[in-house]
UniProtKB/Swiss-Prot annotation:
First-level EC class: oxidoreductase
Highest taxon of the lineage: Eukaryota
Protein name per Swiss-Prot or TrEMBL: Protein DMR6-LIKE OXYGENASE 1
GN (gene name): DLO1
Pfam families: 2OG-FeII_Oxy (PF03171), DIOX_N (PF14226)
Length: 349
């Protein structure tokens, strides 16, 4: 018999249940079919960034071009974020979710416009079927504008998160330069069109699930970002849609996973494409992932780079739009496999 979800705010409240609540159960046509998922193998490229600013830069830029155009996802090693910074971030994030609920729910909100909030599922006010995920989401650039609203417990949370966010932002800026070059653009092109830039983080907590075949941590979706940089623990759960099938991405220690978001797809005029991915859960182990989402500022105007558009053989696929228009559309819906970008296609003549 399905467990009642009334009066419970977080999915972690149900982790010890025998069955998942009925409002987490996906229709039969929309279940993860875990037995049909392929193991990762060489599912996404692994790129070594050690010489990104050395004599092999052109080689690495070409590797990025290939990964972005063929996969939309890649892993990176020798990325410049110190291991100690990464380890502290994972430790304090897990400590946050292991606190008593009375401490965690101080930050609870179902309002997606809040710049720091604990919540559950994806957009709990719009999701018709809930997802087996709790999350803390926060804005982190400029850090001084937001740090005082971040959780103060665990006591080291703000200091550790600020150190991590600063280090990952530096990595993102290096990647954006290289990706700009991979498109044949000036290295500062993408950074310049993002306005003041915006950086968000999410701390995704996926508790053990008694019936993982019936639900998702997050269903298939594409990111609204320019790029996303994902730190995950050693519990498998990320899956990428490649060649008409779902492929599991096995965690590799000391790496990040990077994926192209919708805004990069627009800027590149479809040369690089945002890719469907999802998170699944399991019966035995909790899973923690920490994505950094990099966005334009809300007043930035996004559109295909002029250098990638011509009237002969490369017409603009998307119209230009203020990023706030996309942002509002993205959050006024549940998470869906259909991309928001369909609403931003350029008119055809």
């Amino acid at each position: 018999m399905a467990t009642s979800a009334i009066s419970k705010l977080l999915v972690s409240d149900f982790a010890s249940s025998v069955h998942i609540p009925s409002n987490y159960v996906r229709p039969i046509s929309d279940r993860p079919n875990l037995s049909e998922v392929e193991s990762s193998g060489d599912s996404i490229p692994l790129i070594d960034l050690r010489d990104l600013h050395g004599p092999n830069r052109a080689v690495i830029v070409q590797q990025l071009a290939s990964a972005c155009s063929t996969y939309g996802f890649f892993q990176i090693k020798n990325h410049g974020v110190p291991d100690t910074t990464v380890n502290k971030m994972q430790t304090v994030a897990r400590e946050f979710f292991h606190q008593p609920e009375s401490e965690r729910v101080k930050h609870y909100s179902a309002d997606p416009t809040k710049t720091t909030r604990l919540s559950t599922s994806f957009n709990v006010g719009a999701d018709k079927v809930l997802n087996w995920r709790d999350f803390l989401r926060l804005h982190c650039f400029p850090i001084e504008d937001f740090i005082e609203e971040w959780p103060s417990s665990p006591i080291s949370f703000r200091e550790v998160t600020a150190e991590y966010a600063t280090s990952v932002r530096a990595l993102v800026l290096r990647l954006l330069e290289a990706i700009s070059e991979s498109l044949g653009l000036e290295s500062d092109h993408i950074s310049n069109i993002l306005g003041k830039h915006a950086q968000h983080m999410a701390f995704n907590y996926y508790p053990p699930c008694p019936e993982p075949e019936l639900t998702y941590g997050l269903p298939g979706h594409k990111d609204p970002t320019v790029i996303t940089v994902l730190l995950q623990d050693q519990v498998s759960g990320l899956q990428v849609f490649k060649d008409d099938k779902w492929v599991a991405v096995s965690p590799i220690p000391n790496t990040f996973i990077v994926n192209i978001g919708d805004q990069m797809q627009v800027i590149s005029n479809d040369k690089y494409k945002s890719v469907l991915h999802r998170a699944v859960v399991n019966t035995e182990n909790e899973r923690l992932s920490i994505p950094t989402f990099y966005f334009p500022s809300t007043d930035a105007v996004i559109g295909p780079a002029h250098e990638l558009v011509n009237e002969q053989d490369s017409l603009a696929i998307y119209r230009t739009y203020p990023f706030v228009e996309y942002w509002d559309k993205f959050w006024n819906r549940s998470l869906a496999t259909a991309s928001c970008l369909d609403a931003f296609k350029a008119p055809t003549t």
